[in-house]
Amino acid sequence: MRKAKKLLPFVLSLMLLSSCGAPASSASGYRQITMDEAAKMMKDEKNYIILDVRRPDEYADGHIPGAINVPNEEIGTKEIAELPDKSQLILVYCRSGRRSKEAAEKLVKLGYTSIAEFGGILDWKGEVLSED
């Protein structure tokens, strides 16, 4: 019994530390990934959508190549024609990361099953296109 009491803090510490390296995942069902992970997925995956959830004027000022624009404020208000396949991988970003998290949560509630949120374009190191 005494050995078990001495081992308990050690075992609990190991459990806590082992979860530190796990990929971030929201209780609401989407994954949070890093910019580097997003860039790798864009390079390696074939069937994905890059979703920019900023306002149209922000999107026009600069967006990731291939991204489609569905403003966060519109998600959940109507059917999203641009996202017909609810099982398709959707990589979500905004300006700083706040709206993309909100959008990812809404998409999960709408039944989308493969959502990866990677923050904001402010931290994006890859190519950015603008519509001048």
What residues fall within each predicted segment?
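Rhodanese-like catalytic fold shared by cysteine-dependent sulfurtransferases
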Residues: R2-P9, S18-D36, M41, Y48, ...
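Residue-level signal for mature regions of secreted extracellular proteins and peptides
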Residues: S13-L14
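Mature N-terminal segment immediately following signal peptide/propeptide cleavage
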Residues: R54
